[in-house]
Amino acid sequence: MTAVRIAKAEDKKAFYDLWKICFGDSDAFCDWFFRNRFAPDYSVVLETEGKIVSCMQAFPYTLWIRGREIPGAMLCGVSTHPDYRKKGYMGQIFTYEMKLLREKGCLVAPHTPAVLQSYFPFGHFPVADAAYLTCDG
């Protein structure tokens, strides 16, 4: 049986482990991220047979748009364990997450997905181009 629910603080290790499996980021980054950005009350999990196999994180994020403060949540870490992919789990957690964020009053949900096209079936499309600038020194 599968069930989608709001994450709990005690799910942090499962989120961390799934992030490492799916994205391969360094321990230093993951440690920082989960210490500073993990917000279980803004995140969702999908469990099957009592095991978290898919999750989506978000954390509160305020944007300034045309001089107005807009409440939102930054989406990140949408992940499904490789053994459980192609079962429609992303669609289930995405739908649940969007409902949760609406209930929390979030008007925008920006994200920087590793695979941008994976968000298209759920109605999330780019609204602006981005440029990354670096400087020496």
Region locations from a protein language model:
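A short, internal acetyl-CoA/4′-phosphopantetheine-binding micro-motif in the GNAT/acyltransferase core
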Residues: 75-85
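Conserved active-site alpha-helix within GNAT-family acetyltransferase domains
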Residues: 102-107, 113-131
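Conserved acetyl-CoA pyrophosphate-binding loop and the N-cap/start of the following alpha-helix
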Residues: 84-96
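Core nucleotidyl-transferase/polymerase catalytic module
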Residues: 44, 53, 76, 114-116, ...
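Short coil/turn motifs at secondary-structure junctions
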Residues: 61-63, 83, 116
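Short amphipathic alpha-helix that is part of the acyltransferase structural core
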Residues: 1-60, 67-74, 137
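Extreme N-terminal leader/targeting regions
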Residues: 89, 107-108
